[in-house]
């Protein structure tokens, strides 16, 4: 299992798969499955009519993307993607930073 370095609210870009090129913030991180849910990426699901839902129809469900298909967008230069690294701050706490711009991440 990979270590998930992404957090809710990080601005990411999909770099592979069906939704390649899509950008958006992370809504939810599924650590046990190494997946993230990104705003704006949905799967369309056909729902058959049932007693509870007599209409049925098409429903949009949020889709998750594997973390290997996602890259962080650099907070300083919004057009570049970067990796996440860690650094020990002056107060002794471990802080996430963007590797390219050395900017601190929330």
UniProtKB/Swiss-Prot annotation:
GO BP annotations listed: translation
A molecular function (GO) term: rRNA binding
Paired cysteines (S-S): none
Gene name tied to this protein: rplX
Name of this chain's protein: Large ribosomal subunit protein uL24
A Pfam match: KOW
Annotated function: One of two assembly initiator proteins, it binds directly to the 5'-end of the 23S rRNA, where it nucleates assembly of the 50S subunit. One of the proteins that surrounds the polypeptide exit tunnel on the outside of the subunit.
UniProt xrefs under NCBIfam families: rplX_bact (TIGR01079)
Annotated Gene3D superfamilies: 2.30.30.30
PANTHER family documented for this protein: MITOCHONDRIAL RIBOSOMAL PROTEIN L24
GO CC annotation terms, alphabetical: ribonucleoprotein complex; ribosome
Domain of life: Bacteria
């Amino acid at each position: 299992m990979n270590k998930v370095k992404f957090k809710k609210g990080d601005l990411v870009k999909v770099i592979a798969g069906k939704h390649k090129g899509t950008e958006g913030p992370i809504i939810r991180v599924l650590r046990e499955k190494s997946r993230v849910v990104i705003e704006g990426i949905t799967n369309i699901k056909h729902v058959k009519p049932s007693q509870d839902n007599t209409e049925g129809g098409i429903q949009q469900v949020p889709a998750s993307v594997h973390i290997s298909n996602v890259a962080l967008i650099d907070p300083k230069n919004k057009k570049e993607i970067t990796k996440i690294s860690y650094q020990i701050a002056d107060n002794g706490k471990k802080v996430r930073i963007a590797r390219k711009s050395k900017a601190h991440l929330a």
